[in-house]
Amino acid sequence: MARYLGPKLKLSRREGTDLFLKSGVRAIDSKCKIDTAPGQHGARKPRLSDYGSQLREKQKVRRIYGILERQFRNYYKEANRLKGNTGENLLVLLEGRLDNVVYRMGFAATRAEARQLVSHKAIVVNGRVVNIPSFQVSVNDVVAIREKSKKQARIKASLELAEQREKPTWLEVDSAKMEGVFKRVPERSDLSADINEHLIVELYSK
């Protein structure tokens, strides 16, 4: 399945919630009917079956993190293999992706922009360039903007924007140095309550 390149707002309207795919503290302003399906008049949303609800939740999370179907399924398999709660393990793996950490640290306004920074070799982990967005960041890893990329206006703008967002407690960021430390693995209580990972587990358990 190819990566979606169309309007970001359309995806948020499809899922009925703000997926934070656009730059800004909130991706969608008050004039946009987020609870209305895409289309000129907004298609009426049918009542979902259990399977439909599970599928929608999986699609929502996959789109939030910008992950293709096969890769998302592999994350689920890895989460299921690990000890503990499979759903929580899945979210922890997704949060540990380098592109997500770059976004969470405020170096990019969106995860898509963070993925681009990583792919363009603007990010270093423990002093070494890493250009793989799915790279798993470990506890105590230092993630920073590469020296020659620090003058990019979009990075500075993103850091200013990040000051308006709630700062993740599992990360420690030095905005002046443009670097941060992955202090600990996030707990479920640290992450979005708008995600129902149990529905995803039910979907893949069938």
Curated annotation (Swiss-Prot):
Query: Does the entry feature the keyword Ribonucleoprotein, yes or no?
Result: yes
PROSITE patterns assigned: RIBOSOMAL_S4, S4
Q: Which Pfam families does the record match to this protein?
A: Ribosomal_S4 (PF00163), S4 (PF01479)
Look up the domain of life of the source: Bacteria
A GO term for molecular function: rRNA binding
- InterPro entries from the xrefs? Ribosomal_uS4 (IPR022801), Ribosomal_uS4_bac-type (IPR005709), Ribosomal_uS4_CS (IPR018079), Ribosomal_uS4_N (IPR001912), S4_RNA-bd (IPR002942), S4_RNA-bd_sf (IPR036986)
Q: Name one GO cellular component term.
A: small ribosomal subunit
Which residue intervals define the domain S4 RNA-binding in the entry?
96-156
Question: One GO biological process from the UniProt record?
Answer: ribosomal small subunit biogenesis
Does the UniProt entry include the keyword Transferase?
A: no
Q: Which UniProt keywords apply?
A: Ribonucleoprotein, Ribosomal protein, RNA-binding, rRNA-binding
Q: What does this protein do?
A: One of the primary rRNA binding proteins, it binds directly to 16S rRNA where it nucleates assembly of the body of the 30S subunit. With S5 and S12 plays an important role in translational accuracy.
User: Which family is this protein grouped under?
Assistant: Belongs to the universal ribosomal protein uS4 family.
Assembly and interaction partners: Part of the 30S ribosomal subunit. Contacts protein S5. The interaction surface between S4 and S5 is involved in control of translational fidelity.
What PANTHER family does UniProt report for this protein, alphabetically? 30S 40S RIBOSOMAL PROTEIN, SMALL RIBOSOMAL SUBUNIT PROTEIN US4M
Its protein name is: Small ribosomal subunit protein uS4
Record organism? Haemophilus influenzae (strain PittEE)
- Lineage, please? Bacteria, Pseudomonadati, Pseudomonadota, Gammaproteobacteria, Pasteurellales
Q: Which gene is this protein's source?
A: rpsD
